[in-house]
Structures are given as C-alpha cells and as structure tokens.
C-alpha cells in the first residue's frame, strides 16, 4: 500500500538518491518543500538547474567554476610555482578558509581506489602532469586525505612528479588543535610524531 501520493513519493525517492540522505531525511525534505511558498520552491529549483548547467571544470586546475579559467587560476597574485593537490573542490574551500595557502590548486576529483574500481586514469592526474610540463612549478603539496586511498594517490603522484625535478611535499597529519592525546588512536599519534617540527 502506498502511503503518499505519486508526486510526494517521487520527490522522496529523488531526495533518497542524494549521498547521506536516508528515507526519513528524504521525507522531511519533501514535506518541507511542500510547505514552502511557491516562489521559494521555484527559486530552489532554478538554483539547482542553473548550477547543473553553468558549473564546469576549470581547464587548468580542474576545480569547479562558472568561468574558465577559474578565479584562482586567473589571479596573478597567487604563486603559480606552488600547486596544492587535493581530492575534491570541498578541499579547496577548506584550504582557503585557513587564509594560509597563497599558491594554486589542482583538484583530482577523487582518489585511487582499486576496491571501488577507480584507477589513476579516472582521476585528473594526466591533466596535472600536462600542467607541470606547461608551467614552471617548484613544489607540489600533496593534500589528499589521510586514508589508505589518499596515501596511495599521494605516493603514486609523487613517483610521477619526482623525476621532473619538482619538490613533492605532503601536508602533516596528526592531532587536532584542542584534542587530547589520550583519546587519539595510534596512527594519529604516529603521524603527529612524524610531522613534528622544531619550535
């Protein structure tokens, strides 16, 4: 027996397809939209359609953008000799929030994951290597996540880049600011020790 009418059921099903959205959350979202005024619903649907139509990948860094090249690649005040390699566009946003990094980015749009059937050729690695051949780069900062896949991807890229005479570094991993040592796992503590620096 179907509890909801066709349009509501379809809306719930569509929301359920989103990552991290289960059936109950999909129902809450669907009913929230039903209770919104028509203008707000139309604005939401237009924003979704516009984002899908207008967002593309930057031809230089492979980040998402609505202009090509993106604003970061076309910003002459950024240091083009240092490239920070990240997994996805959300990582660029996280790095930018620190206001510490003044170089450029390269977005891989994923990591090597044989278990998920994702090989190096499915990522934006070839574009990175081409970019390094066209641009004078002194350092690549590998800022992939500290997962098995992130580490494997960083090592794979490092092996490709080192013969080009470019310095390859890895962001430090370790204890979060404000975290207690006693609650940290062994891998985190090991990474914190490896990444220690003189004060």
Curated annotation (Swiss-Prot):
Keyword match tRNA-binding: no
Entry's Gene Ontology BP terms: DNA recombination; DNA repair
Domain of life of the source: Bacteria
Example of a GO MF term: zinc ion binding
Record has Metal-binding as a keyword: yes
The entry's keywords: DNA damage, DNA recombination, DNA repair, Metal-binding, Zinc, Zinc-finger
Domain spans labelled Toprim: 81-176
Disulphide-bridged cysteine pairs: none
Zn finger limits (C4-type): 58-73
Family: Belongs to the RecR family.
Biological role stated in the UniProt entry: May play a role in DNA repair. It seems to be involved in an RecBC-independent recombinational process of DNA repair. It may act with RecF and RecO.
NCBIfam families in alphabetical order: recR
The protein's name in its UniProt record: Recombination protein RecR
UniProt source species: Clostridioides difficile (strain 630)
């Amino acid at each position: 027996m179907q509890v909801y009418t066709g349009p509501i059921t379809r809306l719930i099903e569509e929301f359920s397809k989103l990552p991290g959205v289960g059936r109950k959350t999909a129902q809450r979202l669907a009913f929230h939209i039903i209770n919104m005024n028509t203008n707000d619903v139309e604005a939401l649907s237009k924003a979704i359609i516009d984002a899908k139509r207008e967002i593309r990948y930057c031809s230089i860094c492979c980040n998402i953008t609505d202009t090509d090249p993106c604003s970061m690649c076309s910003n002459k005040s950024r240091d083009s000799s240092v490239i920070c390699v990240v997994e996805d566009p959300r990582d660029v946003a996280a790095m930018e929030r620190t206001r510490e990094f003044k170089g450029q980015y390269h977005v891989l749009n994923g990591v090597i994951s044989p278990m998920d059937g994702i090989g190096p050729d499915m990522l934006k690695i070839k574009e990175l290597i081409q970019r390094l051949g066209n641009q004078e780069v002194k350092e690549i900062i590998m800022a992939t996540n500290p997962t098995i896949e992130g580490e494997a991807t960083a090592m794979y890229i490092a092996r490709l880049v080192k013969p080009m005479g470019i310095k390859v570094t890895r962001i430090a991993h370790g204890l979060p600011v404000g975290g207690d040592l006693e609650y940290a796992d062994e891998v985190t503590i090991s990474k914190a020790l490896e990444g220690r620096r003189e004060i």
